[in-house]
């Protein structure tokens, strides 16, 4: 069923599996129109909210899980999700703190902070926190209607993102979309260490490409065929974008992720700066892992990125780091 959202991404998909047990995959945002659409979708199959016995969540973004708590409260349905998104599902304060820390590391001016915090507050209106859920692990098998749903952990867009595979069908959440690519959003470990999400996303896409699936049922948009081809195309897209980031950085000199985002996405407003910065940080992470970019902390704590020696040599700049930085001989 297709549920409306107030977000630029447009409608979100929820998938009803007749079971037994009757299973709903994702539940839409907490809005009156999405709730009415969910009820109408259930009625179309002769069902009421009380008939839903299991809710499986692909990831902890409000457009996908916002109504899960309300539906479970009515039906007593078991809610299942990956524990890595637990702070999102429970509205833990650390989620907002980590977003602000990511902006600081990226060198985003403090003037953007109020708009970002307001966006987070608006997002908070789109879901009721879960008080409890059953954690899902990679490889878990969920019996459903005489078959089995296989859980595949697909981090990158969100730390606890999962996909479900059964009988040639892939319920992919937001990791595999036909018309757009999922943003590699900034994530932190419980200990406060930033996770390099784009490398994880590419690993997830390559893993999905290898699955025995023929049809994708995505989080947004209609079903489509050939998940392997689409997953491979998305990996190639991110590799090309990383090359573009490398070229801009080599030409511009040392930059913060925010400064690079301003060059790559000029005119980005405060509400979208988090997405722009997260994407640039993701591609920088790929380049750092490949030895083509070096990162260091500036005096104010922001991370500064510069082209590594290998990248500069490849572009015809053969000065070593010491010569460029004025290092004296011992």
Describe these PLM feature segments.
Residues 1-45, 49-51, 163-178:
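Conserved beta-strand hairpin/beta-sheet module of binuclear metal-dependent hydrolase folds
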Residues 10, 33-36, 43-143:
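Active-site HxH/HxHxD metal-binding segment of metal-dependent hydrolases
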Residues 23-25, 56, 79, 171, ...:
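Residue-level marker for buried hydrophobic side chains located in beta-strands
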Residues 29-31, 122-127, 131-133, 141-143, ...:
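Metallo-beta-lactamase
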Residues 58-64, 82, 155-157, 161, ...:
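Histidine-centered divalent metal-coordination motifs
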Residues 73, 154, 288:
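Short, contiguous alpha-helical
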Residues 96-100, 183-190, 264-267:
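Short glycine/proline- and charge-enriched loop/turn segments
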Residues 244-330:
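C-terminal regulatory/interaction regions
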């Amino acid at each position: 069923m297709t549920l409306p959202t107030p977000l630029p991404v447009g409608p979100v998909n929820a998938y009803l599996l007749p079971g037994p047990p009757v299973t709903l995959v994702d539940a839409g945002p907490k809005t009156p129109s999405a709730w009415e659409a969910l009820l109408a979708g259930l009625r179309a199959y002769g069902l009421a909210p009380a008939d839903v016995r299991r809710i499986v969540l692909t990831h902890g973004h409000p457009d996908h899980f916002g109504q899960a708590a309300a539906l479970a409260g009515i039906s007593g349905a078991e809610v299942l999700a990956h524990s890595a998104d637990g702070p999102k599902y429970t509205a833990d304060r650390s989620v907002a703190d980590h977003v602000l820390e990511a902006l600081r590391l990226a060198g985003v001016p403090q003037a953007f902070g109020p708009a970002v915090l307001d966006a987070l507050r608006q997002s908070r209106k789109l879901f009721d926190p879960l008080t409890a859920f059953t954690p899902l692990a990679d490889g878990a098998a969920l019996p459903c209607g005489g078959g089995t749903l296989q859980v595949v952990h697909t981090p990158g867009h969100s730390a606890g993102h999962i996909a479900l595979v059964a009988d040639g069908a892939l319920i992919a959440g937001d990791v595999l979309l036909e018309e757009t690519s999922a943003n590699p959003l900034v994530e932190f470990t419980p200990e406060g260490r930033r996770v390099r999400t784009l490398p994880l996303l590419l690993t997830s896409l390559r893993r999905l490409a290898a699955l025995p699936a023929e049809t994708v049922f995505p989080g947004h948009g209609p079903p489509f065929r050939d998940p392997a081809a689409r997953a491979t195309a998305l990996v190639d897209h991110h590799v090309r974008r990383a090359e573009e980031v490398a070229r801009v950085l080599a030409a511009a000199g040392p930059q913060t992720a925010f400064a690079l985002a301003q060059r790559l996405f000029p005119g980005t407003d405060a509400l979208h700066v988090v997405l722009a910065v997260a994407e640039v940080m993701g591609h920088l992470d790929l380049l750092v892992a490949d030895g083509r970019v070096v990162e260091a902390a500036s005096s104010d704590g922001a991370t500064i990125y510069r082209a590594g020696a290998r990248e500069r040599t490849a572009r015809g700049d053969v000065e070593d780091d010491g010569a460029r930085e004025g290092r004296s001989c011992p």
